[in-house]
């Protein structure tokens, strides 16, 4: 197994500690060859569900934002990636401030992608957004790893599984959930 496969495998073993168990050597080698996307639900927020009435994208003061713990968790995700020598090809984020902040604190960079936006209050938008996500997954170059920072409703809609705040789901080009878990520095 080459260094890249080993590093991705290290990360997947940490991710795989949750319900799925540690992935096999074959699945690790396949993900290293074929690539995939690490979906990350934004890290911990101030208490609440959804956003306050009348919130506005681009106006963080009108939204539910990361808590101090959530900011530390995001920094920890970035440290975990650095510790394992992993560099995603792209970091894409929902336009919600809590997702942008998670991406910025973890990776120092991100691009907004409206397909990752929450559909909590606009469920009629979920099907077209999930189609866009699946299309990009299918077009992912072999061996490429991307990070998408998003919301529970998007991750559940794509995979059928429910993520905790800050949890990562590794999905392959077909949208199949391969591993899941929390990434913390030191692990």
Regions found by a protein language model. Give the residues of each.
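N-terminal export signals
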Residues: 5-21
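Active-site-proximal alpha-helix that buttresses catalytic centers in soluble enzyme cores
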Residues: 23-123, 131, 161-187
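Glycine-rich phosphate-binding loop signature in dinucleotide/nucleotide-binding domains
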Residues: 84-86, 140-143
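Generic beta-sheet signal
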Residues: 35-38, 142-150
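A short, acidic, amphipathic alpha-helical segment used as a generic capping/interface helix at domain edges
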Residues: 130-140
């Amino acid at each position: 197994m080459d260094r890249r496969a080993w590093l991705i495998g290290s990360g997947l073993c940490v991710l795989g500690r949750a319900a799925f168990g540690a992935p096999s050597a074959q699945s690790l080698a396949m993900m290293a060859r074929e690539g995939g996307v690490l979906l990350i639900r934004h890290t911990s927020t101030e208490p609440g569900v959804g956003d306050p009435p009348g919130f506005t994208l681009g106006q963080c003061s009108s939204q539910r934002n990361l808590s101090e713990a959530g900011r530390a968790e995001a920094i920890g995700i970035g440290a975990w990636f650095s510790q394992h020598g992993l560099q995603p090809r792209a970091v894409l984020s929902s336009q919600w401030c809590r997702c942008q902040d998670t991406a910025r604190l973890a990776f120092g960079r991100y691009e907004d992608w409206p397909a990752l936006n929450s559909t909590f209050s606009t469920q009629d938008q979920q099907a077209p957004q999930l189609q866009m996500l699946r299309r990009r997954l299918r077009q992912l170059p072999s061996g490429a790893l991307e990070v998408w920072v998003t919301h529970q409703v998007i991750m559940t809609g794509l995979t059928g599984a429910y993520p905790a705040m800050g949890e990562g789901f590794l999905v392959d080009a077909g949208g199949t959930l391969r591993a899941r878990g929390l990434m913390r520095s030191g692990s």
